Amino acid sequence: MDEIEGYGQDAALQFRLMTLNDIPDVMVIEHEAFTMPWTEEAFRNELTNNHFAKYMVMELEGRAIGYAGMWTIMDEAHITNIAVREAYRGRKLGEKLLDELMRTAAYLGMERMTLEVRVSNLVAQRLYEKKGFESAGLRKGYYSDNQEDAMIMWANLPPAGRSGEEEGSVTDS
């Protein structure tokens, strides 16, 4: 189990599939994290109508503190969103969330993962680079709130079961 610094030895970080009941908590995170947050309807659509969509919630002590989503198409995963509550940032929780999303994608048979990130979001870019993502170009004027460019990044995923962890190291909750 993961232990979070400053939360004591018994504090466990949990990951689980997002449900419709999570949307109110996700909306709080969404509004804290993004200048152009998705709507409740967008999340509802993703969870009920998009068979390519996979979303997870990260909980600490039973409380949603982050979430991430991706579309899995053929052998590629496209990260749609990843965000952590403002009060929990700076504690490597975004990294843990990204790790879990990458593990899940590999488990589902995905070989590569892609995302777009604001060119001004250097903190996120450093995290993605640390996890093996490389820049593959720009989408000019991608963000409609300020016409900021998006950096396109790609990473190869390790085959499921060979992500650098020992077999049996992941515990079920």
List where the protein language model places each region.
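Acyl-donor (CoA/ACP) binding surface of acyl/acetyltransferases
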Residues: 88-91, 140, 149-151, 155-158
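Conserved catalytic-core motifs of GNAT/GCN5-like acyltransferases
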Residues: 2-3, 116, 129, 134-151
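Conserved phosphate-binding and hydrolysis motifs of nucleotide-dependent enzymes
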Residues: 19, 62, 66, 92-94, ...
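Conserved beta-strand segments that form the floor/walls of ligand-binding pockets within enzyme
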Residues: 57, 78, 83, 92, ...
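Conserved acetyl-CoA-binding loop-helix of GNAT-fold acetyltransferases
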Residues: 84, 90-104, 122, 126-130
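Acetyl-CoA-dependent GNAT
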Residues: 2, 7-9, 14-87, 98-108, ...
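Conserved GNAT acetyl-CoA-binding A-motif
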Residues: 105-116, 139
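Positions that flank functional sites
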Residues: 45, 120, 142-143
